[in-house]
C-alpha cells in the first residue's frame, strides 16, 4: 500500500520544456519507462528543500540496483539564482543523478500552475526567499501521477512507494 496520498484516478503528468541542469532540454515525458519523483524548490532554501533532497537520496540508496529506474526531477522556483550550473552543483551534492529544471519566470509559472504549485517571493532586508508548496509528485513509468507525498515523510516511506511503482 502506498504511503503517499493516492491520485484516483491517476492522471497524466503535464509535460513541460525547461533548461536542465545537465545542459539539455528537460521534459517530464523523457522519463517514461522510469518512476519519477518530481519536486519544486530552490537552491538557497535552508530547511525544507535540502531535507527533501536528502530524503530522496537516502530512499534511492535503499532501493539498491532498482534506483537506476528512478529519476528525481527538481524544478526551481527561483530562476534568478538557479541557473543550470548552480542547480547541477547543488543537486550533485545530494546525488549526481538528480536533474534540475529552470527557465524564465513565465515558463516556471506555467509549470507550477499545471501542477498546482504555489510559490511566493518574500523580501527579507536586501535579500529574498520563497514560500512554496513542499509536496512531491510520484509519477509512474507510463507518465501518470499516482501519488502526492507531503513534506516530512521518511526515506523508508519513499522507498516503499517507489518499490510498489517499480513493480508495476
Question: Residues of each region from the PLM?
Answer:
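N-terminal targeting signals for export/organelle localization
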Residues: 1-15, 19, 168
Amino acid at each position: 500500500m502506498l504511503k503517499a496520498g493516492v491520485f484516483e484516478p491517476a492522471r497524466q503528468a503535464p509535460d513541460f520544456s525547461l533548461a536542465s541542469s545537465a545542459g539539455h532540454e528537460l521534459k517530464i515525458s523523457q522519463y517514461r519507462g522510469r518512476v519519477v519523483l518530481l519536486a519544486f524548490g530552490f537552491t538557497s532554501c535552508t530547511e525544507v528543500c535540502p531535507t527533501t533532497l536528502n530524503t530522496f537520496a537516502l530512499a534511492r540508496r535503499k532501493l539498491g540496483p532498482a534506483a537506476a529506474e528512478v529519476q528525481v526531477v527538481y524544478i526551481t522556483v527561483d530562476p534568478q539564482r538557479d541557473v543550470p550550473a548552480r542547480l547541477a552543483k547543488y543537486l550533485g551534492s545530494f546525488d549526481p543523478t538528480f536533474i534540475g529544471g529552470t527557465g524564465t519566470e513565465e515558463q516556471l509559472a506555467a509549470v507550477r500552475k499545471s501542477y498546482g504549485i504555489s510559490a511566493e517571493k518574500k523580501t527579507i532586508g536586501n535579500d529574498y526567499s520563497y514560500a512554496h508548496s513542499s509536496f512531491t509528485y510520484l509519477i509512474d513509468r507510463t507518465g501518470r501521477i499516482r501519488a502526492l507525498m507531503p513534506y516530512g515523510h521518511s526515506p523508508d516511506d519513499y522507498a516503499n512507494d517507489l518499490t510498489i511503482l517499480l513493480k508495476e
